Amino acid sequence: DVYLASSCTEEWGGDGAPKIVAELQRRGIELFLVCDEGGAIITEPIGGIHGNFAMVGVFEKGKADVKFTARSNGGHASAPSKGTPIARLSAFVNEVETHSPFRKKLLPEVSAMFTELAPYAGFGMKLVFGNVWLFGPVLKAVMPAISAQAGAMLKTTIAFTVQKGSDAYNVLPQEAYVGANMRFIPHQGEKESLEIIKKVADKYGLETEVLHANDYTPPVDIHGEAFHLVEQTIADTFPGLPSSPYVMTGATDAQFYQPICKNCIRFAPVVYGPEQMKGMHGLNENIEYNLSLIHISEPTRLALI
């Protein structure tokens, strides 16, 4: 049987997908394979590797929204004391940005990605990507500089996205805060990553409040039947298109299907060039309509596995 599930609440974290899963559970249905968005046909997936590649998402990093608050007695800005809330928050953000407390590691899925991409790289990158067992330390050191996307596949990340201080320029705030979005990697999951960042925040006298958190999803077996079926379908539909495992640094509704499916794969037959990748959730977000949903006349096999 084939089920087409659609929810309009994914972008804002609504309950559309969980309700669908709850109904499937009520019916006693377990799925062999789920195909959601996330991975795609990506042009230049890593700097220095040119061409189109089917990047198949095999798991999602966990995520959390965290609020860090600094407090003081306030006062007038004409006579500031040291260690104001904003000063402490700034020092905290600076430390986390310049000296990440999270450990980098090459996961099996990431190593497999580099191995698959190696034949399409220049000599130097081909040598490194094709011998991850030897050049792993080099990759961990240079990949964040080459590609932010690849760097995010190596460790837990934190991005500071919200801030608030005083309501007036001449008033020292009694309370100021910054908000951050964290993405957890399997080797330092939700619990460990939150403990690590709290220890750093404690150094600056900050309160840490976790507003929402969920851990990473179990990886799909990249040597299993479901993953190979998707790879074969891609090869049949797009002859000559290389495919590779891919770590989803963002989030999709597929995460909610994990209780009823061991093979939640993130891939849509849509082409994303460098401009589309840079514009995602930003200025001039767009998609090349003439390149999307290629070969839809072929009974849309990939969407209906």
Task: Give residue ranges: language-model regions.
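Flexible glycine/proline-enriched surface loops and loop-helix/loop-strand junctions
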Residues: 49-52, 69-76
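Short, solvent-exposed beta-strand/turn "edge" segments of beta-rich domains on protein surfaces
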Residues: 59, 80-82, 151, 168-173
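Short, solvent-exposed loop/turn segments at the edges of secondary structure
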Residues: 15, 29-30, 50-51, 59-65, ...
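Acidic/histidine-rich catalytic neighborhood of metal-dependent amide-processing enzymes
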Residues: 1-55
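An extended, acidic, His-containing surface patch that forms the Zn2+-binding/catalytic region
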Residues: 42-43, 50, 102-167, 174, ...
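Positively charged, low-complexity/disordered segments
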Residues: 298-301, 305
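A common structural junction motif
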Residues: 96-101, 199-206
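A short core secondary-structure module
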Residues: 18-24, 78-101
